[in-house]
Amino acid sequence: MAVAALALLALLPQALGQHNSSYVDYNVEANPDLFPQCLDTISLSFPDCQSGPLSKNLVCDSTASPYDRAAALVSLFTLEELIANTGNTSPGVPRLGLPPYQVWSEALHGLARANFTDNGAYSWATSFPSPILSAAAFNRTLINQIASIISTQGRAFNNAGRFGLDVYSPNINTFRHPVWGRGQETPGEDAYTLTAAYAYEYITGIQGGVNPEHLKLAATAKHFAGYDIENWDNHSRLGNDVNITQQDLAEYYTPQFLVAARDAHVHSFMCSYNAVNGVPSCSNTFFLQTLLRDTFSFVDHGYVSGDCGAVYGVFNPHGYAANEPSAAADAILAGTDIDCGTSYQYHFNESITTGAVARDDIERGFIRLYANLVELGYFDGNSSSSNPYRSLGWPDVQKTDAWNISYEAAVEGIVLLKNDGTLPLASPSEGKNKSIALIGPWANATTQLQGNYYGDAPYLISPVDAFTAAGYTVHYAPGTEISTNSTANFSAALSAARAADTIVFLGGIDNTIEAEAQDRSSIAWPGNQLELISQLAAQKSDDQPLVVYQMGGGQVDSSALKSNAKVNALLWGGYPGQSGGLALRDILTGARAPAGRLTTTQYPAAYAESFSALDMNLRPNETTQNPGQTYMWYTGEPVYAFGHGLFYTTFNASSAQAAKTKYTFNITDLTSAAHPDTTTVGQRTLFNFTASITNSGQRDSDYTALVYANTSTAGPSPYPNKWLVGFDRLAAVAKEGGTAELNVPVAVDRLARVDEAGNTVLFPGRYEVALNNEREVVVEVELVGEQVVLLKWPEEVQGVAGDE
């Protein structure tokens, strides 16, 4: 028997111990019981294409196509060897000199699941802010820089055998409902414009471009599709079967995945745990073949990985398959190429014996994975002449970390929610605010700064460390914890506040209550944090500033702080990464000026209690008491709106476009014109939204611009409140009259809407295109003529995925 098969047999008792007759109730339990080897971070090495057993095989011929090279490799496998390598932890084929490989690496906001050393070289990698904070900068270049640095560090670790060549990132699900525990991993609640832009910049940064000569790392767009709940009300993500209309699928739950495939050319997708409309995502031919490959133009030989344990989930808890061999067969035939788990490795033999699958079905998925590894230079030796990324090493990790982009991302993303003029604080060197009370469960945070999916960082700078280093006399007292109701430490916090010139409370939420497999039950401030803030506000003197930092990925209802005149300023700081303390400090002191904007809506606490978080319908519905979801459809009054963010200065916007009566475009002319620079006619620029932005205040500052569209005449009713069509960030607009020119292209398809059948349609009618929530500049646009379908939504038919 092949060595690879023997290696897997050694693990069989553990695997069977998992999958026995006393099944875990995964309709409630949200963590899959993965066997230890699935979680392994193995030492990686490269095939020897110079003198090893594969050296004469086509896989080692760099002039052949990636597909032909991968197919030639797979043709050498016995059936047992092929099946043994279909999981994320692949034992390789020792007789062929093919080393073990681990598909599962993470790079959400830095390297995770890397083989870090205890100290010295390869003992850390840069820990960036969580995506929800970086996205709040509304800076596409920044996201690309972050991803590029992550991929450089990933390749350096890979060359040392400490990290894989493909990563299970980015998470581009939308932060639809505020209780979601993994919203921190995403860019926010807007799908096509914000999340799609984030996906494009992150993926092209990770992969080294759109169509790079040398693929840097292979990114994975996850989780496809309709995944945005962990365990709300004891409904496990592993067993959720969500109902989504074709209209909402096309309009909200998949457009960012379309951009990832069609435009960014992502090399991998991950299918999700949940089922949609009765079909588990990893056995959903409509998702994995009809949409991804036939409609979204997923790259040739791009591969699909199941989320870890999701193939098993087709059987338990979904019950879509009668047993685990049938689940494995359903998934591979639908288009799930690699199983992050063990179902393929342990049950394909039975699936083949029963005739449910053939060797060709299994080969198809494995060839796709290894065609990617070919493109990544896995078989091309150690020479940098064959692949420039093979020369990267520890000095490149140190060099890219020294660029300080983690700090930059944090300061650019922090959002100023409220300010009565107290901020920025005067510095100790000016003879004011020499002492500061840092109070709250985030005041001395270190590991908390990283959020989830983090690796070892070079350093973690807490707020206490940062203010101490700046020369402040720091009075630190936690006062309370994230979720406690104990007031035992209130008195120490109140004493610290009385001893200081300035009070800063740092609290909110963290990964103890929002995390993978853990949703929140409420979006109110947890525990007794608001009570402590109220007491701090009540005792402070009128000339003593009280500033509150609301931390964490999800929003909490801060209406009590918004209305309390004694709370002088309120900011949102997310999970700010390794330099978080410095970023939080520098925003308060004015060393840097805030220009971030919320990428989610801050709802009143009652919102999360008024309807089911499993209601995936975006549009308001009186019957279900759904008040509408996201800024596009919410019918209530938010505490702070999507896109809200204040500055330390005053900006004025003016535009010659706004003086124009109206732009009129003929739909037939628009959709029949040549578009040599874009993949589709819908991606053509309709017009450029322009404005002059003048800083009339007293501080230099970046300016963030969000451009929205709205209509009350075009397309089907109901009509959304508005939707984002573009954004930009203007850097360092000079104070006292400095001016910068804003130019945001608005594509044809940004004015399109989605009909009930899921088709993306350009409808005739009148539209307004406006700058920011304040509508500082408004341009009127009219589309005339007959409506035109820009993207036809395919009919859902479940079947077997075809060959390429």
From Swiss-Prot:
- Name the residues annotated as catalytic in the UniProt entry: D307
Identify the metabolic or biological route this protein is part of: Glycan degradation; xylan degradation
Signal peptide positions are 1-17
* Entry-listed glycosylation sites: 20, 115, 139, 234, 243, 349, 382, 404, 433, 444, 485, 489, 621, 652, 666, 688, 710
State the top-level EC class: hydrolase
Query: What's known about how pH impacts activity here?
Result: Optimum pH is 4.0. Retains greater than 90 percent of its original activity between pH 2.0 and 7.0 at room temperature for 3 h.
Q: Which of UniProt's keywords are assigned here?
A: Carbohydrate metabolism, Glycoprotein, Glycosidase, Hydrolase, Polysaccharide degradation, Secreted, Signal, Xylan degradation
Q: Write out the catalysed reaction.
A: Hydrolysis of (1->4)-beta-D-xylans, to remove successive D-xylose residues from the non-reducing termini
Recorded hits in InterPro entries, A to Z, give: BXL, Fn3-like, Glyco_hydro_3_C, Glyco_hydro_3_C_sf, Glyco_hydro_3_N, Glyco_hydro_3_N_sf, Glycoside_hydrolase_SF, Ig-like_fold
- UniProt xrefs under SUPFAM superfamilies: (Trans)glycosidases, Beta-D-glucan exohydrolase, C-terminal domain
**Thermal dependence of function as given in the entry:** Optimum temperature 70 degrees Celsius. Remains stable up to 60 degrees Celsius for 30 minutes, but loses activity at 80 degrees Celsius.
GO biological processes? arabinan catabolic process; xylan catabolic process
Q: Which compartment or compartments is the protein found in? A: Secreted
The EC number(s) attached to this protein equal: 3.2.1.37
The entry's cellular-component GO terms read: extracellular region
A molecular function (GO) held by this record is:
xylan 1,4-beta-xylosidase activity
Q: Which family does it belong to?
A: Belongs to the glycosyl hydrolase 3 family.
Q: Describe the function of this protein.
A: Xylan 1,4-beta-xylosidase involved in the hydrolysis of xylan, a major structural heterogeneous polysaccharide found in plant biomass representing the second most abundant polysaccharide in the biosphere, after cellulose.
Supply the name of the protein.
Probable exo-1,4-beta-xylosidase xlnD
Q: Which organism is it from?
A: Aspergillus japonicus
What gene is it encoded by? xlnD
